[in-house]
Structure formats: C-alpha cells, structure tokens
Amino acid sequence: MIILHVKVYNLILKTLNKKNQKVRILLNKQLSKYLGIDFGIKKSGVSISDSNKLISFPLETIETKNLLDYIRQISIDENIEIIVIGKPLKLNNEIHGLEEEIVKFIKSLKNYLPNIQVERIDERFTSKISKKIIIKSGIGKKNRRDKLIIDKISASLILESYLIQKNK
C-alpha cells in the first residue's frame, strides 16, 4: 500500500472531480486513521492509528474541556474515520459513574463532527496495564506517577484493543 503525506492526499482529493467520486471515496477510506480516547473529567488521553489501521500510537493528554476542538483539528489533519472511546465498566460489569459524562461528550461529539463514526470498547484494566508498561519501559519512579503519560498510553491500549477486534 502506498502511504501518502496528508497534504499530498488532500491535494489529490481537491483535484479529483465529481466523475471520480468512487476513487475519492476509496482513497479517503484507505488513508484514514482511527482515534482512541481515554476520557477523563479533567484530562483525556488521545491516541491514533496508522493508516493501515494495525498499530496505535499514544499522542498526548489534553484538558477535557479542549477535547472537542482538539478532535476537530486532528480529524482534519489526519483524516480520522472512527473515534474509539473507552467504556468504563467495573469488574461486575456495572457501568462506572464516569459513563454519564462520556455519553454527554459523545452526544456533543456527534453534533460537532457528524460524519465521524464513534465506537465504544471495554477499557477495564487499561490504567493498570499502562502503569506496568511505564515500569517496564524504564521510566524513573518520579515520572511513573505522571498521570499524563498513563492517560495517553491508556488511550493507545483502548484503540489497540479495538484494532485487534476489528482485524480478527
């Protein structure tokens, strides 16, 4: 598969006319990416897939109040097709209290970006796994407690789980 830079891709799309709508749709789908979100009340972790939709990469942790604008911009820059948001379930399968806020956020997101599909996936244990990844990576004790790192790695794990499920 050919991997094109987003700016080159956008230029190609602009030059295609209405007669080439099928080519446009195919090109758009092939070069799109997925976004993963570990939603939090104050801060949220964000991750992104490659254009082959096989690998997830932690992006950053941002203030949740700025999340919609951030997603809008990255959706334009990276041609985001699907946003995967973690679903916080307890061990007994009960829904965590944070779910109410996530549902409100998703409603706003769908109004703000109606052409982007939103998917949900169980996010149990992502924070614990993130902490173990950080420990194994050799990051010092002081930086291990940095919630910003944990959130973006958790977002990457959420997206990775979705990609594995989708590519089975």
Q: What is the role of each PLM region?
A:
Residues 12-35, 41-42, 47-168:
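Phosphate- and other anionic-substrate recognition elements at nucleic-acid/protein interfaces
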